[in-house]
């Protein structure tokens, strides 16, 4: 049925970050402004080949030329480009932080009863994958895993659950995210049949109690919005966790990102580059880069490739990977 005769989807190998073929370590502060500018121009040209998502009307109407980049570490910004005051929704970039929230509040032993930690080679919204796995989500970076986790945020209502998560995230990361009600209305205007099927299958198999509550909470979380400074602070929280967050908890989240943060291309990309990433269909990539000082890459550019990952941010990461292989 797709997972093997003797396979148990709940058998989870306790994770560490998988090792890339050659760990990319570089001093990004040594890169000249001229080199950054050359890479940014080339990446933005590649983005002309991407497409805007059509299944969320408001995202299909954004300016495909929008671009913003911050790369830096706990000591500050190394390089900045584009319009960093642009606002955008997190969409699937919220997933690592939902995973972090659940691990922080519930712990791994509870969480592994609800979601798995294996990569998937099917699309992020695959109902077929969930059916093959008996309703047990493959990992927390695909829609089934995130919808499942959203169903377990404390709160009696959708609004209370979203507010509980948002308050925690803004406080912990010291950012100023907000719920974009116009985008949420746009999401509701064109219901997603795959996500609906996923939510009902999760409920039928007992992984969530209420399909509607889980799905609508997930929709609100995806519509949390901010600017590049907020995205950078979220990355800093993963790279340099401060109490009460535990380093082993953020390490577990980053290990999942390495396996599944870019969906089908995740493991191959990580093994080639050493970069740990999470993308969102709004045009975001948040990446954790190994360096003498743990580095954060936060980039916004709306056009997507066929897998649903933003073209320009991926191109920039490829340029950085090539740089690190030579230095």
From Swiss-Prot:
GO terms for molecular function: glutaminase activity. SUPFAM superfamilies: beta-lactamase/transpeptidase-like. Gene3D superfamilies: DD-peptidase/beta-lactamase superfamily. Its EC number is 3.5.1.2. Substrate binds at residues 92, 143, 195, 218, 263, 281. Keywords: Hydrolase. It catalyses: L-glutamine + H2O = L-glutamate + NH4(+). It is an enzyme of class 3 (hydrolase). InterPro entries: Beta-lactam/transpept-like, Glutaminase. Disulfide bonds: none annotated. GO terms for biological process: glutamine metabolic process. Pfam families: Glutaminase (PF04960). Homotetramer. Belongs to the glutaminase family. HAMAP family: Glutaminase (MF_00313). This is Glutaminase. The gene is glsA.
